[in-house]
Amino acid sequence: MAEKDIDKLLSMTDSKYRLSVVTAKRALQLRSGAPSVLPVEQRVRTRNLVTQAMRELATGKLTVGTSLLDEQRFHQDYVRQRQAQIQAQLNAERERERD
């Protein structure tokens, strides 16, 4: 990201540490399937979700502490998805053992 965006992001929080925590939480939300608030043409053309989270915060469409998505709900969804993946792997292994 450009330095001007970093300065803007730092002005939105009380410290660079809080900014890093907020950015990391938003990146985890995106990884868990949260929709991006950016229009398609403004989305980052990279898989780096931290960069995308920083861009979202820099646009002002998300504000620290108020409009970030429900973290607990997305964490629960992520845990459910992961458990389903593990169960599918176990079932596949059991099927191979039967053959």
From Swiss-Prot:
It holds the Pfam family RNA_pol_Rpb6. It is an enzyme of class 2 (transferase). Its EC number is 2.7.7.6. One of its GO terms (molecular function) is DNA binding. Gene3D superfamilies: 3.90.940.10. InterPro entries: DNA-dir_RNA_pol_omega, Pol_omega/Rpo6/RPB6, RPB6/omega-like_sf. One of its GO terms (cellular component) is DNA-directed RNA polymerase complex. GO terms for biological process: DNA-templated transcription. It comes from the Bacteria. The keyword Translocase does not apply. It catalyses: RNA(n) + a ribonucleoside 5'-triphosphate = RNA(n+1) + diphosphate. Keywords: DNA-directed RNA polymerase, Nucleotidyltransferase, Transcription, Transferase. NCBIfam families: rpoZ. PANTHER family: DNA-DIRECTED RNA POLYMERASE SUBUNIT OMEGA (PTHR34476:SF1). Promotes RNA polymerase assembly. Latches the N- and C-terminal regions of the beta' subunit thereby facilitating its interaction with the beta and alpha subunits. Belongs to the RNA polymerase subunit omega family. The RNAP catalytic core consists of 2 alpha, 1 beta, 1 beta' and 1 omega subunit. When a sigma factor is associated with the core the holoenzyme is formed, which can initiate transcription. This is DNA-directed RNA polymerase subunit omega. It comes from Deinococcus deserti (strain DSM 17065 / CIP 109153 / LMG 22923 / VCD115). The lineage of its organism: Bacteria, Thermotogati, Deinococcota, Deinococci, Deinococcales.
